[in-house]
């Protein structure tokens, strides 16, 4: 089984997946993209690599028992997609605290308020495969437990349970 853990940068994907207890191989997709050159160049304005999603899919071929973590994870084939969410003002604060430029943090906070990643995940995988989890007040261990429940089939798909539109 392939499980994708995705969300806007700053929602807690890396921290949570590092705490997940699972037999699945944990793949930090952004690291793989950098290490294996699975990019199509650099976005100078955002100072980030642009992933070559076809190359990413090819690199992941045969890795069927995996927990794939990245803000891009919802773009790869997966049986279940966990979308981590965080209140936009808290998300923006987290990003600034970790050294992201204020403009980039604000852009990500707006994307979170607009449900960008959630909408993309539902469009690519369908509502029946998407599990929305609010990380705003949750500890990393609680988020990890929620992800484990998705992996184990103990949590029902949920879309639209988190609403941050008042932050627009």
UniProtKB/Swiss-Prot annotation:
Region feature (LID): 97-107
Summarize where ATP binds, as residue positions. Answer: 10, 12-15, 98
PANTHER family from the UniProt entry: ADENYLATE KINASE ISOENZYME 6 (PTHR12595:SF0), POS9-ACTIVATING FACTOR FAP7-RELATED (PTHR12595)
BP GO annotations: ribosomal small subunit biogenesis; rRNA processing
Query: Known catalysed reaction(s)?
Result: AMP + ATP = 2 ADP; ATP + H2O = ADP + phosphate + H(+)
Q: How does it assemble?
A: Interacts with uS11. Not a structural component of 40S pre-ribosomes, but transiently interacts with them by binding to uS11.
Asked if the Swiss-Prot or TrEMBL record annotates the protein with the keyword Ribonucleoprotein, the reply is no
| Name of the molecule in the record | Putative adenylate kinase
The domain of life for this entry's organism is Archaea
- Its gene? adk2
Q: Name one GO molecular function term.
A: ATP binding
Describe the task this protein carries out: Broad-specificity nucleoside monophosphate (NMP) kinase that catalyzes the reversible transfer of the terminal phosphate group between nucleoside triphosphates and monophosphates. Also has ATPase activity. Involved in the late maturation steps of the 30S ribosomal particles, specifically 16S rRNA maturation. While NMP activity is not required for ribosome maturation, ATPase activity is. Associates transiently with small ribosomal subunit protein uS11. ATP hydrolysis breaks the interaction with uS11.
Q: Which HAMAP family match?
A: Adenylate_kinase_AK6
* Location of region: NMP: 28-51
Q: Which UniProt keywords apply?
A: ATP-binding, Kinase, Nucleotide-binding, Ribosome biogenesis, rRNA processing, Transferase
Taking the record's annotation, the residue ranges forming a coiled coil are: none
Q: Which organism is it from?
A: Natronomonas pharaonis (strain ATCC 35678 / DSM 2160 / CIP 103997 / JCM 8858 / NBRC 14720 / NCIMB 2260 / Gabara)
């Amino acid at each position: 089984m392939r499980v994708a853990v995705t969300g806007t940068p700053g929602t807690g994907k890396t921290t949570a997946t590092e705490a997940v207890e699972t037999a699945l191989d944990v793949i930090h997709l952004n690291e793989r993209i950098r290490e294996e050159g699975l990019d199509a160049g650099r976005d100078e304005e955002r100072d980030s690599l642009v992933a070559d999603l076809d190359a990413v899919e090819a690199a992941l071929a045969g890795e069927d028992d995996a927990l794939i973590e990245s803000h891009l994870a919802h773009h790869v084939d997966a049986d279940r997609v966990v979308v981590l969410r965080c209140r936009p003002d808290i998300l923006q604060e987290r990003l600034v605290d970790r050294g992201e430029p204020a403009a980039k943090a604000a852009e990500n906070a707006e994307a979170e308020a607009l449900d960008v990643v959630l909408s993309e995940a539902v469009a690519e995988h369908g509502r029946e495969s998407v599990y929305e989890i609010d990380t705003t007040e949750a500890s990393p261990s609680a988020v990890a437990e929620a992800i484990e429940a998705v992996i184990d089939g103990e949590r029902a798909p949920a879309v639209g349970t988190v609403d941050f539109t008042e932050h627009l």
